[in-house]
Structure formats: structure tokens, C-alpha cells
Amino acid sequence: MVLQNDIDLLNPPAELEKRKHKLKRLVQSPNSFFMDVKCQGCFNITTVFSHSQTVVMCGNCQTLLCTPTGGKAKLTEGCSFRKK
């Protein structure tokens, strides 16, 4: 556990910065991102928002790519992704 007095304010640990609210970080950055999701059936790549609020289907084979949750969208098992 890191005490508040032991933190270097100019170079805070990455794990502490990641847990902070997006506006209270040393450099403000959003928690959301766009990602390329590869379909497991036809290998078609679809761009999906990480916090998508709707079900995303593949454009070619109509396979379910991700389902919404309360926060980040849950990818279907077998789908691979990369951040944009």
C-alpha cells in the first residue's frame, strides 16, 4: 500500500493514475476508445465503440460481436480486437 506522503507528484505510478477519475488524472484522458473487432466467422473487421450501448452485429454474416453492459461492451467469445 502506498501512503499519500510517499507519492512523487511529478511522476505518479501508472497504477494509481489509472484508478483515478478521468478528470482528476495528471493528464486528463477518456476511459473510452474505438476498437477494431475481427469477426470469428468471416474475419471481417468492424469498428466498435468500447462503451457501446447497442448490440453490434457483423456486417457480412450477422454474427453477434459485442453486447452492452452497464459500462464497457462485452465482446463475444472468440472475437479479437485492437485499440485504434
Swiss-Prot record:
A zinc finger (C4-type) spans 39-61. Pfam families: Ribosomal_S27e. GO terms for cellular component: cytosolic ribosome; cytosolic small ribosomal subunit; nucleolus; plasmodesma. Coiled coil: none annotated. Binds 1 zinc ion per subunit. The keyword Transferase does not apply. Signal peptide: none annotated. GO terms for biological process: translation. GO terms for molecular function: mRNA binding; structural constituent of ribosome; zinc ion binding. Its cofactor is Zn(2+). Keywords: Host-virus interaction, Metal-binding, Ribonucleoprotein, Ribosomal protein, Zinc, Zinc-finger. InterPro entries: Ribosomal_eS27, Ribosomal_eS27_Zn-bd_dom_sf, Ribosomal_zn-bd. Belongs to the eukaryotic ribosomal protein eS27 family. (Microbial infection) May interact with Tomato yellow leaf curl virus (TYLCV) and papaya leaf curl China virus (PaLcuCNV) C2 proteins. This interaction prevents activation of Jasmonate signaling, thereby facilitating viral uptake by insects vectors. This is Small ribosomal subunit protein eS27z. The gene is RPS27A.
